Amino acid sequence: QYTDTVFQIDNIRWEDTDGGEEPEDPVGGDDGWLVPNYSGYTSPTSYSGYELVWSDDFNDSEINTDNWGFDIGGSGWGNNESQFYTNRNAYTKDGMLIIRAEEEDYAGNSYTSTRLKTQGKQNFVYGRIDIRARLPEGQGIWPALWMLGKNFSEVSWPKSGEIDIMEMIGGNNRERTVHGTAHWNNGGINADYSPAYYGGSKTKTDGNTLADQFHVFSIVWTSDSIIWYLDNVQYHIMALNNSADLAPFRKEFFFIFNIAVGGNWPGYPNNSTVFPQRMVVDYVR
């Protein structure tokens, strides 16, 4: 019960990194919210021809810092976003990772959130990736489960390459649609700044949204292609030829999990947007 769409993304979604210190503690950590017993799709624990090489089921009492670090800062992140990312708006509870977007005036921003990353800790190339998550919702809410090239710090974006396993934007019934996209630099790593984008989407037609229950967002990544799946149903494929443009996708990448608030693509929260908003991640494998 899905419809398929292939599209070319025209928005630029990279950022200027702000490493500034927070002036005071924002709202963060476990705020007492009881994690609902969400239903939804669960992926197999194994696949023929694959070996599990890394996972995080978020069963520890705290976020595992051997796997995850934090991006800290505001300044719009290149997309005119409205949140300030802290290390206090995410925590583990009941075997889940919870990332919370909060409405509050903080360091010149109107919202706080968290952006977790495995940069410098865990990097990956090729294989199957499954992420089981229940998404937030509302106008101006922009959750993402994505990857950047390991060499991002050296070559910057888009030369590092980017793989968006899942993006969703909230409001106007857009919570029914998942977007999967790749970003790279036209002309390869030695060319001038020339972003290129190609992605696909899948829209649920069963009356439910991606915020109603858990879904599994997946890619199967080889030297020849990247294939995107929602609940193990393929909805997009990108062939990887041997051109210099696509060379980044034959190197290691790291994960980023975040909720952005506002920005050029989703627009901004309005009176209909309810805060806090939470993304609940059951596992990544």
Task: Describe the function of each predicted region.
Residues T3-R285:
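GH16 jelly-roll
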